[in-house]
Design a protein with these regions (language model features):
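Residue(s) in the substrate-gating loop at a strand-loop-helix junction
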Residues: 145
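Short C-terminal tail/terminal secondary-structure segment
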Residues: 2, 96-99, 150, 210, ...
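Alpha-helical segment proximal to the catalytic Tyr-Lys
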Residues: 130, 174-178, 235
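C-terminal substrate-recognition "lid" of short-chain dehydrogenase/reductases
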Residues: 83, 122-125, 215-244, 248-249
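Substrate-binding pocket helix/loop in short-chain dehydrogenase/reductase
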Residues: 100-102, 106-114, 196, 207
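Active-site helix of classical SDR
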Residues: 125, 161, 169
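Canonical Rossmann dinucleotide-binding motif of NAD(H)/NADP(H)-dependent dehydrogenases/reductases
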Residues: 4-36
Length: 251
């Protein structure tokens, strides 16, 4: 039974104003959670909250810059003050970054991608974990990618960051497994989000062709796996990396 499995629990979702993050926030709210919609774009976060409130959910818009530890700390504090003890977190905020080979990759672009996609996950867990422990335990899902275990030419920073997320997830899970906190990572394939909707048709077709399922993923499919990992149905699952990729990694 999944209908209201998160009733009474507070969840913080970063990058939650659109795409996968919004799908996760919507699913958790629909199953009873109080959700902090955390995003760099406060106006977009407020729009998402309005949509959640329209379906009867309790939600809070929180502005956060995951590259700034002080901003992340403040976002976690605001969440707890506004919605109550934190027991669930989804660290989803991320960017794609520039496309270039390693030998020609701009160091500033490298730092920008790592700061968001890897440092941001560390900062998020750094400030979420004390609150989750104080709440008596809970679960975290970090959004990695199929590129968390595979290479992809032209995306060295993104691939390195997403590999790092998988490693960080495993280490953190070991540290907190005996304290009632589970930590897992999700590895989506290419998902039909706003980031890809404006892609060149040929490039989009090439991405679709990478998936034996013959299509891009849907944000709701990633949200479904994420919600499962956060739930008590996954009570013996921690420290692992879970694919939702239409067969991409099976090739």
């Amino acid at each position: 039974m999944t209908t209201q499995e998160f009733t009474g629990r507070t969840a913080l979702v970063t990058g939650a104003a659109s795409g996968i993050g919004l799908a996760v926030a919507t699913m958790l709210a629909g199953r009873g959670a109080k959700v902090a919609v955390a995003d760099f774009r406060l106006d977009a976060a407020r729009e998402a909250v309005a949509a959640l409130e329209a379906i009867g959910a309790e939600a809070l818009a929180v502005q956060v810059d995951v590259t700034d530890p002080a901003s992340v700390e403040a976002a976690v504090r605001t969440t707890v003050q506004g919605l109550g003890p934190l027991s669930l977190a989804v660290n989803n905020a991320g960017i794609g970054g520039a496309v270039a080979p390693t030998g020609g990759y701009d160091p500033q672009d490298w730092r920008r991608v790592l700061a968001t996609n890897l440092d941001g996950v560390f900062y998020s867990m750094r400030y979420e974990l004390p609150e989750i422990l104080a709440a008596g335990g809970g679960a975290i899902v970090n959004m990695s990618s199929i590129l968390g275990t595979n290479g992809f030419a032209g995306s060295p920073a993104y691939v390195a960051a997403k590999h790092g997320v998988v490693g960080l997830t495993k280490s953190t899970a070991l540290e907190y497994a005996g304290q009632g906190v589970r930590v897992n990572a999700v590895g989506p394939g290419f998902v039909d989000t706003p980031l890809l909707k404006d892609a060149d048709p040929a490039a989009r077709a090439a991405l679709i062709a990478l998936h034996p399922a013959g299509r891009l993923g849907r944000a709701e499919e990633v949200a479904e796996l994420t919600a499962f990992l956060l739930s008590e149905r996954a009570s013996f699952i921690t420290g692992s990396y879970h694919l939702v990729d239409g067969g991409y990694s099976a090739r």
